Amino acid sequence: MRYLTAGESHGPGLTTIIEGLPAGMPLLAEDVNKELKRRQGGHGRGARMRIEKDQVQITAGIRHGKTLGAPVAMFVENKDWKHWETVMSIEPVPEKNEKSRRVSRPRPGHADLVGGMKYGHNDMRNVLERSSARETTVRVAAGAVAKKLLHELGIEVAGHVLEIGGTRANLTRDYAVREIQETSEASPVRCLDGVAAEEMMQKIDDAKKNGDTIGGIVEVVVGGVPAGLGSYVQWDKKLDAKIARAIVSINAFKGAEFGVGFEAARKPGSEVMDEILWSKEDGYTRRTNNLGGFEGGMTNGMPIVVRGVMKPIPTLYKPLQSVDIDSKETFNASVERSDSCAVPAASVVAEAVVAWEVAVAVLEKFDGDRFDTLKKHVEEHRNLTKEF
């Protein structure tokens, strides 16, 4: 299973095409729209979220609420397009209009300058329109489809915010996936710790007042995962590696860790490895989950626990120093409409990309042509691993 996305931030809209879904899987537009709505929420979002009310148009691959086994095409309209029709026109426009909203002062930390160098664009708008996090709209749409597939197989995905601007949630226990879903949805910053959430919101407000931005850390937990997804036999078959790649592919994300993550470097092996248990009711389990649900690049039946770190958004309302590519003189960088903090929304994007990789791994391991046989094979596998 794979997908491609297309579209610019201020173009007519964004498109994704998914290939490889099994036939007969239940899927409605509402399954996607509820995830799009979640992405648009969160304390710290900018003015654009008051303009865009994202709704998906499914244009291919579904009939009467079920997948056909053919490619699924989805489109999300950009409501703000009407204000950008000339600037972002597909057809040629007069030269004076062509230079309208031209960007010649790249923003530090963004794709602007290097993208312009790479593709020969003397207007960095050609770069920023595609590199914008607006593209994550259709990544969330694709992830919503993956989450639906996993849900039907008894696999659930939840994300939450661990840290914003140096304020970290004080979590003294593990949370079940359902509990994470319910608690994070009730928080304006998707944080499980109400006290920390208040401090996070204050830091976001302070950053906005100062024309600045702040980043943070999100965590995604996947429960009900069968053992044996991914493989140890080749480096590029390891599922944790694929998930790590997916996490750092999200705009502004700079790292990923599983389980205790980098803390493992500071502990002896006896405090890191998860002891193996067995019972007739549950089969093989682990006493702890320090490795985040992975051993040898494969799922071990414990919940997947992965975290991603997001840098502050590079668009600042008090811009940093840059250089004009025409005159080579020093100026302040260009300013584009942006958020002061998008960490809560990014947790939804992280859910989507993790769900996608897990769904792909499921389809790689089990028959993916028909959804009814897929469900049967997953259940048979659960029983086999329990009896091993």
Curated annotation (Swiss-Prot):
Cofactor note: Reduced FMN (FMNH(2)).
Database matches in InterPro entries: Chorismate_synth, Chorismate_synth_AroC_sf, Chorismate_synthase_CS
Swiss-Prot/TrEMBL catalytic activity: 5-O-(1-carboxyvinyl)-3-phosphoshikimate = chorismate + phosphate
Record: residues binding FMN: 130-132, 251-252, 296, 311-315, 337
Pathway given in the UniProt record: Metabolic intermediate biosynthesis; chorismate biosynthesis; chorismate from D-erythrose 4-phosphate and phosphoenolpyruvate: step 7/7
Record EC number: 4.2.3.5
Matches recorded under Pfam families: Chorismate_synt (PF01264)
GO cellular component, one term: cytosol
Alphabetized UniProt keyword annotations: Amino-acid biosynthesis, Aromatic amino acid biosynthesis, FAD, Flavoprotein, FMN, Lyase, NADP
SUPFAM superfamilies, per database record: Chorismate synthase, AroC
Cofactor dependency: FMNH2
Major enzyme class: lyase
GO molecular function: chorismate synthase activity; FMN binding
Binding sites annotated in the UniProt record for NADP(+): 39, 45
Family: Belongs to the chorismate synthase family.
Listed HAMAP family: Chorismate_synth
Assembly description: Homotetramer.
Official protein name in the record: Chorismate synthase
Species whose genome carries this gene: Listeria monocytogenes serotype 4a (strain HCC23)
Gene (name only): aroC
